[in-house]
């Protein structure tokens, strides 16, 4: 969890100053493919825990959940951020952690991934972090996609074998997620294929 560390850092750097306000917005996707939170708790419960923790560190915090869909390029999230009033000295920080590859890029009329990035840039954020896996699952050539999948997926399988006990709940969840990805890349096409990793060269 990175947010408690951020809250601690804010609290330690702002001694004897008015408490800062941290606004955290998360997306709740209605898509069935989106993996469940690793913590096994709802966003509502997570938000409550984070707000309570922030209070103990003298940091004011707002936690908001926005319903948005990857299939339309997270347009409702962008719209909400666009209409939110900004106060003086407020910084917008966007963390795109392991989510960009879920946004479709194969629609003929427009590339929703490019549209999302352009609209995000138009918001003029102070910081944007973009983290995603480096592999090519977007090829229309099935053999090329299968080769990329094989070259990439042995790593998480090997990791599970080394670090997770066979039969453990965590390993079952981990392997189910990997199996779903393999099935999605191999057996799905078009809008049904939501795993669209791209290599960093793109």
UniProtKB/Swiss-Prot annotation:
Localisation: Nucleus
Annotated spans, VHIID: 1-26
Residue intervals of the GRAS domain: 1-202
Transmembrane spans: none
Entry keyword set: Nucleus, Transcription, Transcription regulation
Region described as SAW: 187-202
Top-rank lineage group of the source organism: Eukaryota
Region feature (Leucine repeat II (LRII)): 45-82
Keyword flag Thylakoid: no
Expression (tissue specificity): Expressed in seedlings, leaves and flowers.
Entries under Pfam families matching the protein: GRAS (PF03514)
Stretch list, region PFYRE: 92-184
A GO CC term assigned to this protein in UniProt: nucleus
Primary role: Probable transcription factor involved in plant development.
Similarity remark: Belongs to the GRAS family.
Listed name of the protein: Putative scarecrow-like protein 16
Originating organism: Arabidopsis thaliana (Mouse-ear cress)
Taxonomic classification: Eukaryota, Viridiplantae, Streptophyta, Embryophyta, Tracheophyta
Annotated gene: SCL16
């Amino acid at each position: 969890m990175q947010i408690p560390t951020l809250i601690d850092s804010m609290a330690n750097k702002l001694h004897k100053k008015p408490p800062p306000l941290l606004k955290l917005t998360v997306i709740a996707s209605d898509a069935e493919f989106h993996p469940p939170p690793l913590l096994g708790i709802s966003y509502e419960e997570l938000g409550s825990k984070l707000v309570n923790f922030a209070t103990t560190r003298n940091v004011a915090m707002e936690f908001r959940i926005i319903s948005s869909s990857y299939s339309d390029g997270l347009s409702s999230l962008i719209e909400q951020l666009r209409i939110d009033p900004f106060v003086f000295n407020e910084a917008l920080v966007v963390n795109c952690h392991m989510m960009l590859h879920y946004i479709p890029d194969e629609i003929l009329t427009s590339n929703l991934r490019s549209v999302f990035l352009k609209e995000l840039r138009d918001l003029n954020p102070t910081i944007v972090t973009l983290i995603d896996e480096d592999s090519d699952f977007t090829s229309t050539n099935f053999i090329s996609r299968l080769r990329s999948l094989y070259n990439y997926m042995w790593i998480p399988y090997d990791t599970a074998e080394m670090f997770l006990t066979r039969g453990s709940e965590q390993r079952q969840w981990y392997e189910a997620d990997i199996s779903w990805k393999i099935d999605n890349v191999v057996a799905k096409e078009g809008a049904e294929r939501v795993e669209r990793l791209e290599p960093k060269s793109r």
